[in-house]
Amino acid sequence: MLDAKYLRNDINIAAQKLEKRGYTLDVAQFTALEEKRKSLQMRTQELQNERNVRSKSIGKAKASGQDIEPLLAQVGQLGDELNAAKAELTGLLDEIQTLTLNIPNLPDDSVPEGKDEDENVEVSRWGTPREFDFEVKDHVDLGAGVANGLDFETATKLTGSRFVVMRGQIARLNRAIAQFMLDLHTEQHGYQEMYVPYLVNEESMLGTGQFPKFVGDAFHTKPATEEGQGLSLIPTSEVPLTNIARDCIFAANELPIKMTAHTPCFRSEAGSYGRDTRGLIRQHQFDKVEMVQLVEADKSFEALDELTGNAEKVLQLLELPYRKMLLCTGDMGFGACKTFDLEVWLPAQDTYREISSCSNMLDFQARRMQARYRDPQTNKTELLHTLNGSGLAVGRTLVAILENYQQADGSITIPEVLQPYMNGVTVIGAVK
């Protein structure tokens, strides 16, 4: 959520920046609501003051023997007017909050202006795509060939489309990938491993910016009672990890806080009908190792470079070719002010596909969550800056390994860094 004071004082500048990312801020509507808010707040304060004055005069009138009935009637009428004004103000503040909760973050000045992914800027490349002397298979055929290790047909029977059943060596490889990532981030990159709930409440989804804008993209449980609140399956462990800081005040010497977790993620993919219908690329349920950092306000861009580098290290150790992209204004996520995507090479598609997205949210999420730290110089509380990134998406990493490490006979060579997690197995092969 953007700073309300900033919007009041620099609404036109905010509108110009938001326009760059394809969001049109209704300046007239916001200005009108703010004018009405100020008027109502003044009216409420005036009524409160007048009521206090009249209430005090009742005691004096009573002490002097005057008839206090007229004063009591006046105080009662003022009380009714005050309650009505407060109710109207509360409704107006809710309307303003609903508006501001749906406004995306402002793009940083270093972000290139553009409409969509076609205008993202390539920053760098690592590795050289392998040249094959045989016909390349995609991960669906390769996975099926390893003892039916990727079984989409059974998953469709169990649940529906965009799910998978993994078995045998493919399931073990999938687990090995996640374990390797967690070990790397905790042992070399300084993150604390966390185990978090896969179901979260509305406040958590609101805190990280999934709600209210993307409420239709989540899977929800029904409340246990009419009064109870339904829960949502996490679309990413960014939600529970970041919300750990909600309503907290940290000492500066506790920062940065770096957390990582391996969880399933659940997304309805409401806006992707017909896209990536084959295979693991776009699933309703998928595993991801997430990285989250909570830092001081002046450290977040430095932290973004570090966090992105942590994700890159995974790809480098797996020896998977990738490119680093700086997202343009029109392709960034709702809460991000700057984002780097890492795209891994997929031979069967003959292109790079996103495998990690690393974003600096500035204080956008922290303001929603009231996640703060105490500045040691001023002793005042300041909003944290939050960052998150995939380190990596496990399923897409499995896809990349299957396709990049495939052999002519359909077998898969296991990347060297994963072999200890596979009990020394170096090759998994197709059943003949």
Curated annotation (Swiss-Prot):
Its main location: cytoplasm. Pathway: Aminoacyl-tRNA biosynthesis; selenocysteinyl-tRNA(Sec) biosynthesis; L-seryl-tRNA(Sec) from L-serine and tRNA(Sec): step 1/1. The lineage of its organism: Bacteria, Pseudomonadati, Pseudomonadota, Gammaproteobacteria, Alteromonadales. It comes from Pseudoalteromonas atlantica (strain T6c / ATCC BAA-1087). Homodimer. The tRNA molecule binds across the dimer. GO terms for biological process: selenocysteine biosynthetic process; seryl-tRNA aminoacylation. Keywords: Aminoacyl-tRNA synthetase, ATP-binding, Cytoplasm, Ligase, Nucleotide-binding, Protein biosynthesis. This is Serine--tRNA ligase. Consists of two distinct domains, a catalytic core and a N-terminal extension that is involved in tRNA binding. Gene3D superfamilies: Bira Bifunctional Protein, Domain 2, Serine-tRNA synthetase, tRNA binding domain.
